[in-house]
């Protein structure tokens, strides 16, 4: 699995695909959390701007997916 991406569009697309696979129960929860955190950690410069998600990532993922990402990242940071 690729975890380093070229552009914000590619990162957003990978996150969207990962979340959709999780919702369709194609991957286990633990694997989902690990992959999500790995993608975000390896692409922080494209995912975050001023300690918030970039507008392009937010727009491409939508509200429900962003809520899930925020919930998972908050759980991990505890």
How should each PLM-predicted stretch be described?
Residues 1-78:
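Acidic, Ser/Pro/Thr-rich low-complexity regulatory regions
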């Amino acid at each position: 699995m690729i975890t380093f991406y070229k552009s914000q569009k590619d990162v957003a697309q990978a996150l969207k695909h990962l979340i959709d696979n999780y919702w369709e129960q194609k991957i286990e929860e633990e694997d989902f959390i690990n992959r999500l955190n790995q993608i975000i950690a390896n692409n922080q410069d494209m995912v975050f701007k001023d300690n918030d998600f970039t507008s392009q990532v937010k727009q491409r993922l939508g509200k429900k997916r962003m809520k899930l990402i925020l919930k998972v990242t908050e759980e991990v940071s505890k």
